Regions:
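Acyl-CoA/ACP chain-elongation machinery
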Residues: 300-355, 388-402, 436-443, 461, ...
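Active-site-proximal alpha-helical scaffold in enzymes
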Residues: 190-204, 257, 261, 268, ...
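Conserved catalytic cysteine-centered active-site region
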Residues: 47, 142, 147-189, 227-291, ...
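Hydrophobic alpha-helical hairpins/lids featuring a short glycine-rich hinge
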Residues: 188-248
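ACP-dependent fatty acid/polyketide chain-elongation machinery
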Residues: 1-180, 372-384
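Conserved small-residue
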Residues: 195, 220, 285, 292, ...
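Condensing-enzyme catalytic core mediating Claisen C-C bond formation in acyl metabolism
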Residues: 5-12, 16, 332-425, 430-431
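Short, well-ordered amphipathic alpha-helical segments that serve as non-catalytic structural scaffolds
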Residues: 190-203, 258-261, 288, 370, ...
Length: 473
């Protein structure tokens, strides 16, 4: 069987820079370098996404119904749009980082010679009663509780989090408002709108694609490494009893990290083809991409949807990564900048003077086809994915630390490019899209990997970019 080349015919999704399709998000990251017409078009698109303006009969209008030109949108909303995109201070719709909820434990003892007592509803009594409690009935619903020993209580309290920045979707853009979302976790709502953006970016109706392939020649590979941790997923599942609430019938199922693929198959494509969910920490998208290109190269599928969706801006994720010392904190940034006022927009600093990475939410998807089908349909081809390399690190003490697998992965990728394009093309016209996580360890280890691989292939000038500086991790 002739091996087919997987090509990208559509891409889309959303992150802190906005919508990915047609390079809208990329334009936001380089907006300072764009000419005025291109800048104003980008701002107008973001203004619509953020519900600052709307499009009526092909014209931009504000909330009062006044027609706006691109220049007027620029003058009125540019500052607000720029401040409400990319990495920035965490907004209260996600979490109040100055007053994060937690339970404070306090020990209570009675005044000498006096019992400690309180009145409560009978239905609020714990089961079973503590052995040192005495309960006297006051009426049909209330009781008097007397404590004969010291007691420990947990009370609601609030404290500031040391981590205060994240890559958030543009302010005002709510994925769940774009379709009939019922108790869907944020990450799954992002999945629905993200994959829809990618499909529409192909410029070809999905039914037209399906007329050219068999139903089982479509595959979907998508997942999320952190699962769904908001109140509609695992977050609510694990918090409900501790908060005195009830677990719902949806929280467990919707929290699974396989749900992005399931939602795409059931709610968007109606697919009966191959499906799967592969997770691999920061490289989850690439793990799924590897499965996708294997399906096309082997001839098992002709169309593959690949992607991932993460919504980790919640207290649990911030506390967890923060406990590892992995996140950029306000104090760490203050020490780097040498001033009391912190610029949270500069929290993510790949290969620079940094103190940790910056969490971010995003959903990104690509539509792959074999090259023959793409040409038959007249699809726009944005690029090819001939291979994805993933290697383990062998024996090591720290799972998160880099190892020999990183060197093998990068070297194999460069060798593959040399085989396809020739050594001159790689030496003179290639660049590296680095992981660039913005941790002190990464800036050293990844730099060493790139330097040693470049030396092995005699690459003297190798441009390196790290988009996490704009959109977070």
């Amino acid at each position: 069987m002739t091996s087919r080349l997987p090509v990208i015919v559509g891409f889309g999704g959303y992150n802190a820079a906005g919508r990915s399709s047609f390079h809208h998000g990329f334009r936001r990251t380089v907006i300072e370098s764009m000419d005025t017409p291109a800048r104003q078009q980008t701002l107008a698109g973001l203004a619509v996404m953020m519900k600052l303006v709307k499009v009526v009969d092909g014209h931009y209008q504000d909330d009062a119904g006044n027609t706006l030109s691109l220049a007027e949108i620029d003058s009125r909303f540019a500052e607000q749009i720029l401040a409400s995109t990319l990495v920035r201070r965490i907004e209260k719709q996600h979490l109040d980082v100055d007053a994060a909820h937690w339970q404070k434990t306090i020990d209570i003892s009675a005044t000498a010679g006096q019992p400690l007592s309180f009145i409560t509803l009978r239905k609020h009594l714990p089961e079973p009663l503590p052995s040192d409690w005495t309960v006297d009935e006051l009426n049909a619903s209330e009781v008097l509780v007397t404590l004969h020993d010291n007691c420990e209580f947990k009370v609601d309290s609030y404290r500031a989090l040391p981590v205060k920045s994240a890559g958030q979707l543009p302010t005002g853009f709510e994925p769940s408002e774009l379709y009939n979302a019922r108790f869907h976790p944020r990450g799954l709502a992002m999945t629905i709108v993200g994959v829809t953006d990618a499909l529409r970016a192909t410029g070809i109706e999905w039914q037209a694609i399906m007329q050219r392939v068999a139903p089982d020649e479509v595959a979907v590979f998508a997942s999320c490494i952190m699962s769904q941790l908001d109140e509609n997923g695992f977050g609510g599942l694990m918090q409900s009893r501790l908060k005195g609430g009830r677990v719902t019938a949806k929280q467990l199922a919707l929290g699974l990290n396989t749900m992005p693929a399931d939602f795409i198959n059931a709610y968007v494509l109606g697919s009966v083809g191959t499906t799967g969910s592969v997770t691999g920490a920061c490289a989850t998208f690439l793990y799924n991409l590897q499965k996708g290109i294997e399906q096309i190269a082997s001839g098992k599928a002709r169309v593959v949807i690949v992607g991932s969706s993460e919504a980790p801006i919640n207290q649990e994720c911030i506390e967890g990564y923060g406990a590892m010392g992995a996140l950029a904190t306000e104090e760490g940034l203050r020490q780097i900048e040498g001033k009391s006022e912190v610029d949270f927009r500069r929290a993510s600093r790949p290969f620079g003077d940094n103190c940790g990475f910056t969490l971010a939410e995003a959903c990104q998807f690509v539509v792959l086809m074999d090259d023959e089908l793409a040409l038959e349909l007249g699809a726009d081809i944005h690029g090819a994915v001939p291979d994805v390399f993933i290697n383990a690190d062998g024996f090591k003490k720290s799972i998160s630390a880099p190892g020999p697998g990183n060197y093998l992965t990068v070297a194999k990728a460069v060798a593959s490019a040399v085989q396809l394009l020739g050594i001159d093309a790689v030496r003179e016209r290639s660049f590296v899209h680095a992981h660039g996580s913005s941790t002190p360890a990464n800036r050293v280890t990844e730099s060493e990997i790139l330097d040693r691989v470049a030396s092995a292939f005699a690459i003297e000038q190798w441009p390196v970019t790290a988009v996490k500086a704009f959109v977070g991790h």
